[in-house]
Amino acid sequence: MTADELRSLIASGLACDHIEVEGDGRHWSAVIVSAEFAGLRPVQRHQRVYRTLGARMHTDEVHALSMKTYTPAEWAAHPH
């Protein structure tokens, strides 16, 4: 799997304002900004992202995914 493929999978299941994905083909890190995260605890945000990936989380395609999740307001206030 490529970073673009992973980015597309996440975007297909979650309305995102911004997505950054980096990784080596199995171990990934992502920054995801979505209004859908409003009012959710961090673990709930991660669960929303995991749902977009479905069974791929249990294969070698996505062995590990580290996430930073933000609402648009949090992202605007975040130094980047």
Tell where the protein language model's regions lie, with residue ranges.
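Solvent-exposed beta-strand sheet faces enriched in polar/charged residues
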Residues: 22, 31-33, 68-70
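Short beta-turn/strand-loop junction motif enriched in small, turn-promoting residues
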Residues: 16, 37, 54-55
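C-terminal structural segments of small proteins and small subunits
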Residues: 47, 51-80
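A short interface-forming secondary-structure element
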Residues: 32-46
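Short active-site-proximal "capping" loops at secondary-structure junctions
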Residues: 26-28, 37, 72-73
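N-proximal, solvent-exposed amphipathic alpha-helical segments enriched in charged/polar residues
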Residues: 1-16
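Short edge beta-strands and adjacent turn/loop segments
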Residues: 13-29
